[in-house]
């Protein structure tokens, strides 16, 4: 009986202490201030937030969680921040941007992106499956399309790739720029529309879910889009031709500003790189089996006979015709972009001479 009373008394004392500590009597237990993220990285992509919904849960959120909350990533997507595609070049050059998703890591028809390559960025490398395919002897014409590919040229690669594609003209075989004259092409941006004009073609805004019908009915002759998108969308069945044209070849990769990375503590640098490395196969699987389609590489192999590469001399001519456009775009975004483009052109010239 006495033992029960003693236990009851002890229980009451403990309960009373808990009440006091939880503030039920108007007292509050001393608490440490909420830990705020000590470091912040600003991320941007030239696409609306809904375009790549996998990005935050499969990558950005994983990095933040792995850092134990010490790192915050401010996610600004196209349409939600004030920077148009080429203007992001200026933002990056001023060091106001730490991370970005870059579409087309090689020579780009939207030439201001090329300026990013001359800045201190750590860029992603190629997906193993794609490069194995391009190295296949039977795919020499496809491999030649990557005649100026980033892995060879910039020597700054080796991290990650979260998707991959080759850009070109779906529905059209282009042996000469004359083959594009009069063609009605689906174009995803006004930059590409302007580029098509210089070769006598016209660009049209056709929603992705209407492209099959538009191609089949002749409303459009082709589409400026990625090979992966073209095939996985079933568009080969509507217009079974594709010409890879390196006006926008390459990869969709995560880009991290080297300077931003260097400012972080060594352990956080390691956490970012390790998390990206761990998530790379997860995201790649997501692309191949979900975001794009199953049997991606099988599809490319199956349609091998319809895939051709634009000859480098034709590409060079195309680029030469587009140079005035690129100069205009550089002027639109101000002197910083123009200066970077000048440095890039000089780098490009020296690199080309070193390969002769």
Positions of predicted regions on the chain:
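Active-site-proximal, glycine-rich beta->alpha crossover segments in alpha/beta enzymes
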Residues: 133-134
């Amino acid at each position: 009986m006495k033992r029960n009373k003693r236990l009851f008394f002890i229980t009451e004392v403990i309960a009373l202490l808990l009440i006091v500590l939880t503030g039920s009597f108007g007292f509050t237990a001393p608490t440490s201030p909420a830990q705020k993220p000590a470091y912040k990285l600003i991320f941007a992509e030239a696409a609306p937030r809904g375009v790549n919904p996998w990005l935050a849960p499969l990558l950005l959120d994983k990095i933040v969680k792995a850092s134990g909350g010490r790192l915050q990533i401010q996610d600004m997507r196209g349409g939600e921040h004030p920077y148009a595609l080429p203007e992001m070049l200026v933002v990056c050059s001023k060091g106001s941007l730490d991370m970005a998703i870059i579409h087309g890591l090689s020579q780009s028809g939207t030439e201001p992106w090329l300026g990013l390559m001359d800045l201190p960025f750590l860029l992603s490398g190629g997906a193993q499956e794609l490069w194995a395919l391009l190295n296949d002897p039977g795919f020499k014409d496809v491999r030649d399309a990557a005649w100026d590919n980033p892995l060879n040229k910039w020597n700054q690669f080796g991290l990650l790739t979260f998707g991959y594609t080759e850009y070109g003209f779906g529905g059209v075989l282009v042996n000469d720029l004359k083959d594009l004259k009069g063609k009605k092409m689906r174009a995803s941006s006004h930059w590409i529309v302007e580029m098509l004009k210089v070769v006598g073609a016209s660009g049209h805004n056709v929603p992705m879910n209407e492209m099959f019908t538009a191609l089949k009915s002749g409303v459009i002759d082709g589409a400026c889009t990625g090979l992966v998108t073209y095939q996985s969308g079933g568009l080969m069945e509507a217009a079974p031709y594709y010409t890879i044209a390196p006006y926008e070849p390459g990869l969709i990769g995560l880009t991290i500003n080297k300077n931003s990375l260097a400012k972080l503590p060594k352990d956080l640098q390691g956490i970012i790189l390790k998390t990206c490395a761990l998530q790379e196969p997860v995201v790649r699987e997501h692309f191949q089996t979900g975001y794009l389609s199953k049997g991606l590489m099988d599809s490319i192999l199956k349609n091998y006979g319809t895939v051709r590469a634009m000859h480098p001399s034709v590409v060079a001519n195309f680029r030469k015709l587009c140079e005035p456009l690129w100069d205009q775009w550089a002027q639109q975004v101000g002197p910083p972009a123009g200066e970077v483009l000048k440095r890039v052109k000089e780098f490009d010239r020296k690199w080309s001479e070193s390969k002769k």
